[in-house]
Amino acid sequence: LIRGQEGAKAGENYHDLDIWGGGLNANLSWFLGKTAVGFDISKERIYSTALGTSLAENDYKDISGSDRKYDHKGERTNTNIMLEHNFIFGGFTLSAGVLANKNTGLDHDFRFYPGVDISYRPNDNWKIYASWNKALRMPTYTDLYISNVVQQGDITLNPEKNSTFKIGTRYRQTGFSAVLSGFYAHGTDMIDWVQTSETEQKDSKYHVMNIGKLNNMGYNLDATIYMQELI
């Protein structure tokens, strides 16, 4: 914001974001386990003074409580179709599924994101588990469209893609539980705001970019005492 100025001159932006959608889910238990299917669809629409593509003047939208108008608009539709199956045999549980996703902000193609979870319970106290899944994160409207004195968005951004592996064990008895787990996440096309020697030749702004690969590793140790169970 610019001190001493008001409205557009002060750098104020107005945004009106609507998200609506719905979904259906169903599951079936049979002799090979439990199968679930699902479908959901959601639509995002933003009117803004800064984010989105420029509107024709006759399509401007009034801003409540202001003499300014929304002169930018963005919208995209996200569709998910899910299939998952759970199989239990003795102390083993295996869950495998796939998500088919289409986002019109990217293109009109479906992309598939699988996932697998497996766990083993040798007794009532212990659980050992592992999982792997793939996921995608779309750029935000800010990532795509923002343009001011310090930031520059990019409408050609690719979505972030992640593959995550987890492994862990859980112990539970009356009054106490403990979890030890570790993870490894491999990301590509990760989105970040950066300054480089190339961008500094153009301006002093931070530019949003797909910076490439990013690997994260970590572990977690958590212990909980349930006093109400010990009393």
PLM regions: where:
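Face-selective signature of the C-terminal outer-membrane beta-barrel domain
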Residues: 1-111, 119-121, 179-180
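Flexible, surface-exposed loop regions and adjacent strand-edge segments
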Residues: 2-12, 52-61, 113-115, 145-152, ...
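Short beta-strand-initiation
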Residues: 21, 80, 113, 152, ...
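Short hydrophobic/aromatic-rich motifs at helix boundaries and adjacent loops
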Residues: 45, 85-91, 136-140, 190-193
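Structural detector of well-ordered beta-strand residues that form the stable sheet scaffold
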Residues: 95, 129-131
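Outer-membrane beta-barrel signature, preferentially recognizing the C-terminal barrel domain
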Residues: 107, 121, 127, 134-188, ...
